[in-house]
Amino acid sequence: DVYKTYLVTVQLAYPSGSELSAVEGVPVKLTGSTGTTYDATTDANGKAAFTVPAGIYEASASEKRASNGYSFILNGVKSGITVTETWTGDSVVEVALTESKSGQVIIKELYVGGCQKDDGSGNYQYDKYVILYNNSEQAATLENFCLGMVNPYNANSTINDYKDGVLSYANDNYIPAGCGIWYLPRNLTIEAGKQVVIALNGAINHTLTYSNSVNLSTADYCTYDIEDFSQTNYYPTPSESIPTANYFTAYKYGQGTAWVLSNQSPAFFIFSTHDVTPEVFASNTDYHYTADKEGNAVYRCTKVPTDWILDAVEVFSQAQLAKSQKRLTPAIDAGYTVLTNAQGYTSYRNVDKQATEAVEGNSGKLVYSYNYGTDGSTDPSGIDAEASLKNGARIIYQDTNNSTNDFHQRKQASLRD
């Protein structure tokens, strides 16, 4: 006998207040309890129709769209859809979409773990850097551009913002930036498909002393403000090749002689204060707070609105994985990448294989058989991004606002390639 089937209509519901609305062609998936999947796409009203046998289903949808210079990612899941012989097909299953917004500029690489010293006496960690990349097709010009990190510095430390297992700011539309922020006193412009290197510690050639380290004397930008952060281990005088106009300036509202980005498990983010200058924003005590540590400046943070945040990455230490907790909210980063520090390893973004292979002119320029992954972590695309870039290819990196999916541990800092 031919088994009976039923019409299931799924309606995608866009967030209230979003500048986006329903469009035709968004992929929607129905997954049965046995693992069987059914695929359909939406019509212009955001509806997708399925014909399925009786069963229990989960509907899911994911959409990525660009608008007004920003990238939008929308995700939604509806579980427990029970289709039985009483199902008439008149009911519409609504899947509420959550929206996250990211800018054109992404964090391509975050190197914080340090390396082993040549004499075997331990590790060296004052060579941190970040590479920002314009993942879009248009030049990006960012005003009032800033760098931030979340307290506590290590993911396995006590997080005072957790209440009954939930971040106290989970639904408050901000991320707390600890200690202080770094900001560029002028606009940051990155051409499409290009990158900038920012030395977060020591804009010098570290390899002259530690051969396993990196050369940051040729960085494009650096963090250097000796009045606020005076510890010379972190901030030696930058290389003369870096113009002083490319120094990031600090605004410190916490305490300390250095902006101590964790060498094990940082939560790092980039943002723009838009029409407010960084100094005015960071000095506004209405944004300041100390989670359960009132009056203690060591714990003072400032609340960065989530819609100001362009990109972020959360890192967990491999050695402290079981004790680590999220500090970034799901709308900013729904996952984490894992790092074994002190080995010269780096957190490197995965390639969007489909998008990269679809770029006109990339044929014959992409280098495959990627072999820089380590400790069971690698780029699933199989594309060697650095080798491909040197070969003239245009790389599109994966950006789903989930570091578990978007990053891997690379066994060598890309600046050493």
Give residue ranges: language-model regions.
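Short Pro-Gly-centered beta-turn/loop motif in secreted/extracellular proteins
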Residues: 49-58
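Bacterial Sec-dependent N-terminal signal peptides
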Residues: 1-18, 95-97
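A structural motif detector for short, solvent-exposed N-terminal "entry" segments of globular domains
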Residues: 97-156, 243, 252-266, 271-295
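Short, acidic Ser/Thr/Gly-rich low-complexity loop/linker segments typical of extracellular
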Residues: 34-47
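Solvent-exposed beta-edge/loop recognition patches
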Residues: 169-405
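Structured interaction patches on ligand/partner-binding surfaces of diverse proteins
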Residues: 65-96
